[in-house]
């Protein structure tokens, strides 16, 4: 009888302890691309990152709508793209998406993105991403293309590309201390 009672108690304890683990873990750091980062109540995922080649037909489309006066990369620089996907997993709350991003190398050099207003592949922050919505919109060119992410464009030095890992940082629009970081696969 005591053995049976002990077995029932062990099973009951396991059920109680197992039921306590329903809360999802919040992740703000990732050592590789593809991991969802929780920033500002939204989930951000780096789909891919890579150097862009202005001579490549596909890449030329990513390098349009740059601010007036933007110079092409110098001999020791390169265009570098980070494609992200943003998801609002909340059921009843619209939230703003991040507009502040940066890349840091191991020497603490910081790079900020170029705005590309009007480029259909470029990331455009929104004031309110609705409940259960995704950015880019799945029906937009950035959403239904092979990458399924919006481009954030940087100009990096070749030296910084060698100072790996590069750290991509997403700063929350509502709390600048809430920062998501991911090491980019270069």
Where are the language model's segments positioned?
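Sec-dependent bacterial lipoprotein signal peptides
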Residues: 1-18
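Conserved functional micro-motifs across diverse proteins
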Residues: 20-186
